[in-house]
Amino acid sequence: MPLLFAGSVFADPDPASGIHVPKDFKIERIYEVPGGQGSWVAITKDDKGRFICSDQYGGLYRVEAGAAPKVEKLEVKISGAHGLLWFQGVLYVSINEAPMKSGVWMVKPQGDQFSEPVLVKEFKGRGEHGPHQMVPSPDGQWIYVTCGNFTDLPGMDGYQPAKVWQEDQLLTRCTDPRGHDPNQMAPGGWIARFKPDGGSWELYASGFRNTYDIAFNDRGDLFGYDSDMEWDFGTPWYRPTRLCEILPGGEYGWRNGSGKWPVEYEDNYGSLVDFGPGSPTGVVAGRGAKFPEAYQRALYTLDWTFATVRAIHLEPQGTSYKATSEEFITGTGLPFTDAVIGDDGAMYLLTGGRKTGSAMWKVTYTGSASTAPVKIGREADPLAAFKSAIDKPTPAAINSLWEKLGSSERTERFLARTALEKLPPASWAPRLDAEKDAWRVIGASIGLARVSTKEDRARALSALDRLDWSKLSSLQRINWLRACDLEFIRGGEPQVEERQKVLAKIDKSFPTGDEMVDRELCRLLCYLQAPGIVGRTLTAMDLAGPGKPPAWTEIAARNSGYGKPILEMLKNLPPAQVLHYVYCLRAVKGPWGAGERERFFSWVDRLASGSGGASYGGFVAELRKQALANATPEERVRFEKPAHAAANPMANLPPVKGPGKDWTVDEVAALAAGGLSGRDKENGRNMFKASLCAACHAFNGEGGDVGPDLTTLGGRFKPRDIADAIINPSAVVSDQFAYSTITRKDGSSLFGRMLKEENGKVIVGTNPFDTTQTVEVPKDEITSMERSSISPMPGALINRLNPDELKDLLAFLTGAK
């Protein structure tokens, strides 16, 4: 017997107050999810216009949205879904957080309920970077599914990209010093497609970090909303959350740690618009909405952290688009998770996730502008020529691909190169011998490095050498250098003559004054141990100036939800150019010239005192360590100790008055319900320190970096949610902060965070308050390593506080007035 729930009665008369939407739009909360129904993260619409929603850690619920929504718990053996799709009379489910096998499941209707779920494709990957959402293709022939970078790529029946992905790092990468993803390698996050019957699986694109959702626009092109690694903030390899057009065979350049590829590299495809920090969740097309034309054609991206829904307006531009971002919904306490367009033309959204309070919202247009359905689709498929060339590689088709290698449009160059990579090199590589066009030479050389043998290396390097460096554009120079990088990465270190030719071409150019060209010149010249590169780079560091705001700053500055640390960092960014030069110079072996080590480590110490994301300081420390490894013994002795010692987070803690008690979630929620306005936030700040919160968590730029930054906590969580997280920290443990239980052959075990692997050993951080305290475990002594469901955070940290002190702490955390 299914359970039915009537629409909740709201305690507050206008739950939409304080939420901003464009003129003539209206947002209303239509259902507040009771605690017993969990926290909803995915939504789809069935063929009767009803909604099916999933609890992140529980089952499925069906909602009939009306004046009083009816909610029914479905009798189906499914739980832990991150993705739902109703298509052609079948429910497809992407399982992520359950005891069930991770992967895509198919559930067919049986009356008004469902039959036994059938596993379509099993994945190895769970959690917030596991398998996510699905979307059907406009022609109904395929279903696309997106998976985060903690989801191993399973075997496929076909591959849109050539199976040639590698890490492609010219210089040794720095893995994340906090141990987030040291063993997650290419292809990273990926998107696949399959037939509605569950067969014919194809890898479609890869190189993402954690694209949670995807959608087709009104012209039938695919887009995804990829995540950032917020701990990288302040480094040159930080990549903001971004909207990407997903091309068949696309590579998007995510690699772990410092290894993320610059967006300028032609061997990956860039983004359409960068948003800055955030937590991407849902993406939905406006198709079918009773909105004005511009909003029907828009894509909508949902940001969980900063309570924002953006409308992305796409203007066709050549073979791609120009994207404009508009804030469509903003507010506080709105952790958006997913959205869908209903049969009534309204947009329905979910808020929730991580066991927070959850709700369903409805957005309608109330103005007088026309809401007539717009024409969708396009007259011709711009990818048709590329597809036919791969299917039927006639000489004429290969001629066409070769011509497009020289296109002024990046999309055409990318698609032409990836198409050629799927064909035998012998069918196109000889054309390089007489080629003079810069883009064709560069693109073909990149392609040959990725797919060919050493026989074609000489051909590619010779063609690159024929180009006139002085006549290349900035982007062409960057990719001329990248082509050389790939030849040496894939084909081995350069021979003496090869090294001499490359140095003769580029050495005197550095520095050029072009920031991105100089980054890539420095990378290759340091790899080649170019004469005098240390002195020239140190001078470039001295002249680099302060950090420059990134291109996405304007978009980020409009978001009032951003906390003080981000806003302050945008005003005073660390000099990413200098940090990149440090990254390169660490590879240059000693001895260096007189005074050069002093200048270098002086810069490293200055960088160490700067601000950045949670991993920023650890990256600087690791660069120092690796630079010392390439120094002479005498230099190591002199510079092994940094000028700035880390502060002790446990020192000088403020006193607590007490008396405390064993607080429960209900007691804390009731305390907060009595009101937090007018509280002593300065004392709340002191209680944040006294309760050891600041030892692990930052708030407004102050505190530790072991746990998540809590600055925007009040914008996402209610006091009850905050109380639950403090008192029951193991209820939800994010992938980013989870510890592992490591069992040795002798039966002993170790609890800690795996930071990295090196020299046959696993480096494990064992102190949650200090990631520098580590234990080395030989890899061959480990029998198992399993993610623990136990949080490293203790569960009674507020029990020393009296009611007034606890209210001050809650007011501080929530930003109560």
Residue ranges and their predicted role:
Residues 1-8:
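Bacterial N-terminal signal peptides
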Residues 10-388, 649-651, 700-702, 778-780, ...:
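Beta-propeller domains with acidic blade repeats across secreted/periplasmic ectodomains
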Residues 30, 347, 659, 667-671, ...:
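C-terminal capping alpha-helices of c-type cytochrome domains
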Residues 305, 340-345, 353, 409-411, ...:
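C-terminal substrate/ligand-recognition segments
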Residues 336-340, 344, 353, 554, ...:
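C-terminal structured "cap/appendage" subdomains that terminate the fold
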Residues 352, 365-687, 706, 713-715, ...:
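Long, ordered, helix-rich scaffold segments
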Residues 686-709, 732-735, 748-750, 756-773, ...:
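Periplasmic/extracellular electron-transfer cofactor-ligation site
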Residues 728-745:
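Short boundary/loop segments of OB/S1/cold-shock single-stranded nucleic-acid-binding domains
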